[in-house]
Swiss-Prot record:
Protein known as: Small ribosomal subunit protein bS21
Encoding gene, per UniProt annotation: rpsU
Taxonomic source organism: Alkaliphilus oremlandii (strain OhILAs) (Clostridium oremlandii (strain OhILAs))
MF annotations from Gene Ontology: structural constituent of ribosome
Signal peptide range: none
Tree of life domain: Bacteria
Length: 59
């Protein structure tokens, strides 16, 4: 769980912005979205292979 401490004389907006940035860097939101619905292992493998194919074509 991401946790920040509000600094002295820091506005709530700035603290919220820091918290959101910290969550984005740690990948919490993307992990939650990934786990929102069950995905069969075969579907995971298929998506992984397609992503590898896309990445290979970029380079």
């Amino acid at each position: 769980m991401s946790e920040i401490k509000i600094r002295e004389n820091e506005s709530l907006d700035n603290a919220l912005r820091r918290f959101k940035r910290q969550c984005a860097k740690s990948g919490i939101l993307s992990e939650v979205r990934k786990r929102e619905h069950y995905e069969k292992p075969s579907v995971k493998r298929k998506k992984k292979a397609e992503a590898a194919k896309r990445n290979k074509s970029k380079f």
